[in-house]
Amino acid sequence: MVVRYPMAVGLNKGHKVTKNVSKPKHSRRRGRLTKHAKFARDLIREVCGFAPYERRAMELLKVSKDKRALKFIKKRVGTHIRAKRKREELSNTLAAMRKAAAKKE
């Protein structure tokens, strides 16, 4: 927001006013995860587990073959960005599993 000065000429001419801050458009929330969608995905993950390609990628991540895992996932899911997101998700899952195993012992 630009501070308006009481000048008769220039870009900031005119009466000082406070700008109305409008709410962001509803169309801007496309792609944001809702509570219900997160719950549904977590439930499905709990019931179904991981797909075979995800299990193989997790095995590659376990032996520190991150780049190979990325190439493998990219071949399966299609795009580089989706593959990076999937690799991150699987590595977070592995870390959580390691943490749970350490807590158990």
Swiss-Prot record:
GO terms for cellular component: cytosolic large ribosomal subunit. Keywords: Cytoplasm, Ribonucleoprotein, Ribosomal protein. Pfam families: Ribosomal_L36e. One of its GO terms (molecular function) is structural constituent of ribosome. It is found in: Cytoplasm, Cytosol; Cytoplasm. It comes from the Eukaryota. Belongs to the eukaryotic ribosomal protein eL36 family. PANTHER family: 60S RIBOSOMAL PROTEIN L36. Component of the large ribosomal subunit. This is Large ribosomal subunit protein eL36. It comes from Danio rerio (Zebrafish). The gene is rpl36.
